Design a protein with these regions (language model features):
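C-terminal soluble interaction/assembly domains
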Residues: 271-319, 323-326
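Conserved hydrophobic/amphipathic alpha-helical signal-anchor segments
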Residues: 50-75, 150-199
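Surface-exposed, charged secondary-structure patches
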Residues: 82-130, 233-240, 245-252, 258-267
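N-terminal secretory signal peptides that target proteins for export/translocation
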Residues: 1-17
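Bacterial signal peptide processing site
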Residues: 36-38
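Extracellular/periplasmic head regions of type IV pilus-like filament subunits
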Residues: 115, 184-279, 283-286, 290, ...
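C-terminal motif of bacterial Sec signal peptides marking the signal peptidase cleavage site
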Residues: 31-34
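Short beta-strand edge/turn micro-motifs at domain boundaries
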Residues: 119-163, 167-170, 295-299
């Protein structure tokens, strides 16, 4: 059964590396270069925002506030518009995250200068980059550039969502194979929908009942679909920033050529899935497709992603799609 818990993104912890090897490392390695290329986001601190005489002073103030859980001090350091950036609103999680950051800072910390003169704080033995850089204002004082930090957080969240959805694509494939091993309506077949009809097991998800097999996927993924929006709008939410669809045909560029996965009203000749960002450029950039062969392809479909991807029905990785290497 495929299901995960969605965790609020926090600036105090590094994004988790998932099981896609070098691809994960490449994405994480892009974090600092992204900062360097974009350059400074603003030139002056917000009114009332704390400034510092040196990066070292800023680092000391930051870790002291983290150790003490001093939210007011943190808000003063990052500016009046930083509430939703530095804190999640979950008191227990914020406390744990701050403590984890303080521990990492205590193990190792140093500042790295970026090309445009800003400084980024690296903490812990893995040199995790704190997402909000330090910048000099016109008077020579240092301040945390929260605007640039927001951009960096968006980039990191996109990277984490994309890594997570590479995993989801693989797990959806496994879910269909698992579904196929069970008899449905007297024959083996792949599911053509995510959510089963009431009292049936004709989709990849059905409510759990004592003494009956569990569905191959959980409700979070099942309702992160256009089908889920129709069934129960209150449960329709993106999973790790993405929505999903089932592909019922493969095109000329797929292995084996053009083929309808359905024969005589039953889908037993293959299957495919598409995973696309709920908000292009905010929750994700790449759209992913996979079929029964287990190879994931990706494509940047641009600003029209959310208009086109929900209507995709064909697995057809032509030259505009790139194979994702593990």
């Amino acid at each position: 059964m495929v299901s995960k818990t969605i965790r609020h993104f926090t600036i105090w912890q590094p994004a988790p590396v998932r099981s896609w090897g070098a691809w994960a490392l490449v994405l994480l390695a892009l974090v600092l270069p992204a900062c360097r290329k974009k350059g400074p986001a603003g030139s002056e601190p917000a009114r009332g925002q704390t400034t510092f005489t040196s990066p070292e002073d800023a680092g000391k103030a930051l870790v002291d506030a983290a150790k003490n859980g001093n939210q007011q001090q943190l808000l003063a350091m990052f500016g009046p518009d930083s509430q939703g950036v530095i804190l999640t609103g979950n008191a227990a999680q914020d406390k744990a995250s701050l403590a984890q950051f303080a521990e990492a800072f205590g193990r190792m910390n140093r500042w790295r200068q970026l090309e445009h003169g800003s400084q980024v704080l690296l903490v812990g033995v893995s040199n995790t980059a704190f997402p909000i850089p330090l910048k000099k204002d016109s008077s020579g004082e240092w301040f945390f550039d929260t605007k640039a930090g927001k951009n960096e957080l968006t980039n990191r969240e996109i990277g984490r969502n994309e890594l997570a959805n590479l995993d989801v694509c693989g797990m959806l494939r496994i879910a269909e194979l698992e579904y196929f091993e069970q008899s449905h309506d007297g024959e083996k077949q792949y599911a053509t929908k995510f959510i089963s009809d009431p009292g049936k097991q004709n989709g990849l998800y059905w409510p759990e009942e004592p003494g009956k097999p569990k569905s191959p996927i959980g409700p979070q993924i099942a309702y992160a679909t256009t089908e889920g929006a129709r069934r129960q709008a209150s449960l329709h939410k993106p999973f790790y920033g993405y929505y999903y669809g089932i592909l019922t045909i493969q095109g000329y560029y797929a292995s084996g050529g053009l083929r309808d996965y359905t024969r005589n009203g039953v889908m037993n000749r293959g299957f495919g899935f598409v995973a696309y960002p709920a908000k292009y450029g905010i929750t994700g950039v790449m759209t992913f497709i996979i079929n029964q062969d287990g190879i994931v392809f990706q494509k940047d479909m641009g600003a029209t992603t959310t208009e086109e991807a929900p209507f995709m029905r064909q697995f057809n990785p032509d030259g505009s799609w790139l194979e994702v290497k593990e």
